């Protein structure tokens, strides 16, 4: 569906509420100038959501016009057994709990087959950190998916999971990522970011990789050519 194009010369400034600096930032965006770090902070502190959305839409339309893009994504969660006990998580399970499960290779292939038949263009893989599984098992999950359908994009393992893999393999993060890329990894999901504030993170997931580790892992992934997402978790302490 084609929507009427926004007027980039008037809409963003309409939400500036007389703020001359916001108007100047909007004019810079409209002129295809890069916003500085300081201007970004000012937007965060002083601009309302609609104003930010209007600026973002100006950039989006410049890049993509009125086209929208999407993929068909299917989740694969190979195990719910997890060594961590994040207070907000309803997914995890203890190893001997009745609800615990772990996929074998046949089950993974079946899931990929279902995704392929449904027209999926991407498999999104996240799961528990199974303390009895070696790093090679997690690599094999990616390898089996890629073998079952070499054309499907594999977005797998969050920064927290990569941190765990480095721990159990006793190898650097870069080496861990290289093994996964060789197996077929195409990008990383943004889970595990949660909230970077140390106090809040310590209360909701104190044993999970800290915010700086998460950022360092994603930075390493970018240096290796992987694209990554980032998520924010809310609905807990606030």
Per-range role (PLM):
Residues 1-75, 79-83:
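Flexible, acidic/Gly-rich N-terminal and inter-domain linker regions that tether
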Residues 18, 22, 49-53, 101, ...:
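Generic structural signal for well-ordered, non-membrane alpha-helical segments
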Residues 27-34, 45, 58-65, 91, ...:
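Generic secondary-structure signature for well-ordered alpha-helical cores
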Residues 51-96, 100-126, 188:
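N-terminal pre-triad scaffold of radical SAM enzymes
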Residues 120-230, 234-237:
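Conserved SAM/AdoMet-binding glycine-rich loop
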């Amino acid at each position: 569906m084609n929507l009427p194009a926004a007027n980039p010369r008037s809409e963003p400034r309409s939400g500036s509420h007389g703020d001359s600096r916001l108007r100047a930032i909007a004019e810079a965006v409209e002129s295809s100038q890069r916003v500085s770090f300081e201007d970004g902070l000012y937007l965060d502190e002083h601009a309302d959501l609609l104003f930010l959305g209007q600026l973002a839409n100006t950039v989006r339309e410049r890049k993509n016009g009125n086209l929208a893009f999407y993929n068909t994504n299917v989740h694969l969660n190979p195990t719910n057994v997890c060594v961590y006990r994040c207070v907000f998580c309803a997914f995890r399970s203890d190893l001997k709990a009745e609800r615990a499960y772990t996929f074998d290779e046949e089950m993974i292939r079946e899931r990929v087959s279902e995704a392929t038949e449904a027209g999926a263009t991407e498999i999104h893989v996240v799961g528990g950190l199974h303390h009895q599984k070696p790093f090679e098992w997690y690599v094999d999950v990616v390898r089996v998916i890629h073998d079952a359908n070499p054309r499907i994009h594999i977005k797998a393992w969050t920064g927290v999971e990569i941190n765990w893999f480095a721990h159990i393999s006793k190898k650097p993060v870069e080496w861990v990522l290289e093994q996964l890329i060789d197996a077929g990894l195409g990008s990383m999901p943004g889970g595990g970011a949660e909230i970077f504030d140390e106090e809040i993170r310590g209360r909701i997931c104190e044993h999970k990789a800290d915010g700086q580790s998460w950022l360092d892992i994603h930075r390493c992934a970018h240096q290796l050519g992987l694209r990554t997402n980032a998520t924010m978790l809310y609905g807990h302490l606030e």
